[in-house]
Amino acid sequence: MPYQVNRRQLLQQLTVLSVMSALPATALAQIVSNAAPRSRFDSNSTAEDVTQGLDLRGQTIAITGANSGLGYETMRVLTMRGAHVVGIARTQAKAEKACSSVRGETTPLFLDLAKWDSVVICATRIRRLVTHLDGLICNAGVMAIPELQLVNGVERQFAINHLGHFILM
């Protein structure tokens, strides 16, 4: 079956595309920003500000990399809003330390995203611990590994940041 092109629609779309590409970047940004509603949040907003009024009681959310940085802050604020957080770190000790330092319901688990058997074990533990999972925040990762390292036949950073989380899901 041959593919048919509606020339009139094609010309209309190409005209819009050519006009958009001819606009200066500032004009295009103005059009896009005017189309989107303005948020009341800005660079001074805190996680508490953004989640104010959010009731997460009864929700279970797992977070990888929950022992530091954005993962830890996410766990802290989600538990503050009533969620049960499964805090996942590379070692059980790190997970326990992070989970015990926040107020609210947490469950510490460990997971090494570079070791796929560890990922499967962690996923199995999550399934045994909770009846349902409302969210998974794939926060853990590595960056700027100085030299090429292979894990399971693929580059380490790709294995940890992408494939490990894919297997976990």
Question: Which stretches of residues belong to each language-model region?
Answer:
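N-terminal secretory signal peptides
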Residues: 1-6, 30-33, 140
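N-terminal secretory signal peptides and thylakoid transit peptides that target proteins
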Residues: 2-18
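Rossmann-fold NAD(P)H-dependent dehydrogenase/reductase core
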Residues: 3, 39-169
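Short, polar/charged, Gly/Pro-enriched helix-capping and turn/loop motifs at alpha-helix termini
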Residues: 17, 24-25, 133
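A generic secondary-structure boundary signal that marks alpha-helix termini
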Residues: 19-20, 128
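N-terminal membrane-anchoring alpha-helices
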Residues: 22-41
